[in-house]
Amino acid sequence: GTQMLHAAGLTMAARYKGLDRIACTFFGDGASNQGTVLESMNLAAVWNLPVIFVVENNGYAESTSIDYAVAVDSYIDRAAGFGIPGVTVDGTDFFAVHEAAGEIIKRAREGGGPAFLECKMVRFFGHFEGDPQRYRGPGELDRIREFRDFSKEVKSGDTVGADIFQIGQFVDA
């Protein structure tokens, strides 16, 4: 979570030097409970710094469910406590993330200050190599894999070849 302090500091230095810069920082839902994250959000809000905070919310801080670690329903609610606007998207939907990030980046570049993007996603594997994931409930991973089987989406036409080609073109650019 310490990179948030760097992002705030970089945007403050850029402002001091007259440079038109923004910073984007990524962190997991577990890191969001570190004091430096909250301090950085407060600093960015007070000084209207163009910092974009992106939390990758997979529901677990290593092995602790967010139900036991976070008192709000959504991380954007926490950001709102600092006066920072935010949006939650399906972090597995490339186009949703791209669209939301584009709007937030535009806002930051226009002097709108900090913003918060919560990307909800699933962690299919453990937090570390060899993690037995005993903290997950019975059948939890099976239900998730059934619900988020991307090969079924491609086969069913929800994600079509043109979409995959468009993603490839964007990544190559």
Predicted regions and their residues:
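Glycine-rich ThDP/TPP pyrophosphate-binding loop and its adjacent helix/strand module
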Residues: 1-173
